[in-house]
Amino acid sequence: MAEGSVMFSDVSIDFSQEEWDCLDPVQRDLYRDVMLENYGNLVSMGLYTPKPQVISLLEQGKEPWMVGRELTRGLCSDLESMCETKLLSLKKEVYEIELCQREIMGLTKHGLEYSSFGDVLEYRSHLAKQLGYPNGHFSQEIFTPEYMPTFIQQTFLTLHQIINNEDRPYECKKCGKAFSQNSQFIQHQRIHIGEKSYECKECGKFFSCGSHVTRHLKIHTGEKPFECKECGKAFSCSSYLSQHQRIHTGKKPYECKECGKAFSYCSNLIDHQRIHTGEKPYECKVCGKAFTKSSQLFQHARIHTGEKPYECKECGKAFTQSSKLVQHQRIHTGEKPYECKECGKAFSSGSALTNHQRIHTGEKPYDCKECGKAFTQSSQLRQHQRIHAGEKPFECLECGKAFTQNSQLFQHQRIHTDEKPYECNECGKAFNKCSNLTRHLRIHTGEKPYNCKECGKAFSSGSDLIRHQGIHTNK
């Protein structure tokens, strides 16, 4: 290889497992991007063909410290047999080289601090001379700084910044987040100003930085190279895998200083803190309603657009949220995973269980400010408030009759369609309301749950009891 060339070992930095564990997911992604980009640059320049194991591991989403690469590998076969190296510790900015056969070589351990990449090359030249290479070069030549391509000069600066995360001079005045590089700072600011200049050619969606487009493209390709060893679930990027693994470890590193509640994800902590501050930064431009999360605003916007992208394959019913579709599908499957510990009754959704549990606790947290009546569910309160407001938003298109509840309109429309979906298994008689079928079944069972407190007479329906009570009041 001619002088002025560069090898992969010259643009690669190794981490021990301890050093790797100190990096957060963002730092690991940055390291991975730099290493893969540099290898790609070498290949495109025709300088390096065999794929190093560390590159294969990074492409598979595995940890790079699994490769115990000697510093001298690929430089000289004689040197490989005589020496072994300690992994580079960037955190201390010290390159430590330990020679195995000190007695033969007459060399001792060297611990030198380097201020530039050129110093590394100078020390390698010094080491080569002591090993018997008069020109200060190994049998396979190393490039010199003046011939160094620009992308390689940036490599060690970038990797240095990965470790020295305290050196972040670029601070965002909006949110206080700090960055080590001006380019990262500029990309971050696009979040606040809403600038999205990177477009996905598949669907036309825009992003604030190029790496987000790369990650987004995996949605279209279905590529999920990062797999969880615990459960086999795969992800499109390594940071998602890192976050997912906290489910198995139970790790919740993000703690709220107000109440002490801890979270697995930083984004969850940020959302939670808005409960304490009352901040709702995401406002709907159509109706002015504000939300604590951008996802809530995104879902809310579908009310105005009428968009329902989540469709049930069984019956064709569509929903604005994927969670609503999941709940709906349990109607078809009969799945009820949420069980009440008090009575054993099971429900298809967690919210339905929460509402049910209030029967046992007697809790009615939703109070009407008009009359003081309390309800177990917020939807019940909203329906009740329409009585005071005189609001009847659900109108029948056939006859113009209006109702306070959508379910009332739905039942009313069966009068026009003559639909009677509730059939008695005893006699085959059908009804347009479930309550009418329930009342009818008492004819067959003889059940009379409504008792008169005056005379003790029992009735099968509440309306029959009310009519009977008129006898006592007219006396």
Curated annotation (Swiss-Prot):
MF GO annotations: DNA-binding transcription factor activity; RNA polymerase II cis-regulatory region sequence-specific DNA binding; zinc ion binding
GO biological processes: regulation of transcription by RNA polymerase II
Zinc finger (C2H2-type): 170-192, 198-220, 226-248, 254-276, 282-304, 310-332, 338-360, 366-388, 394-416, 422-444, 450-472
Annotated InterPro entries: KRAB, KRAB_dom_sf, Krueppel_C2H2_ZnFinger, Znf_C2H2_sf, Znf_C2H2_type
Keywords: Cytoplasm, DNA-binding, Metal-binding, Nucleus, Repeat, Transcription, Transcription regulation, Zinc, Zinc-finger
SUPFAM superfamilies linked to this entry: beta-beta-alpha zinc fingers, KRAB domain (Kruppel-associated box)
Domain KRAB as annotated: residue spans: 6-77
GO cellular component, one term: nuclear membrane
Compartment(s) where it occurs, according to its Swiss-Prot or TrEMBL record: Nucleus; Cytoplasm
Gene3D superfamilies the record matches: 6.10.140.140, Classic Zinc Finger
Signal peptide: none
Tissues in which the UniProt entry reports expression: Expressed in heart, placenta, liver, pancreas and with a higher level in skeletal muscle.
Function: May function as a transcriptional repressor, suppressing transcriptional activities mediated by MAPK signaling pathways.
Family of this protein: Belongs to the krueppel C2H2-type zinc-finger protein family.
Notes concerning its domains: The KRAB domain is responsible for the transcriptional repressor activity.
Protein name: Zinc finger protein 383
Organism (species): Homo sapiens (Human)
Lineage per the UniProt record: Eukaryota, Metazoa, Chordata, Craniata, Vertebrata
Encoding gene, per UniProt annotation: ZNF383
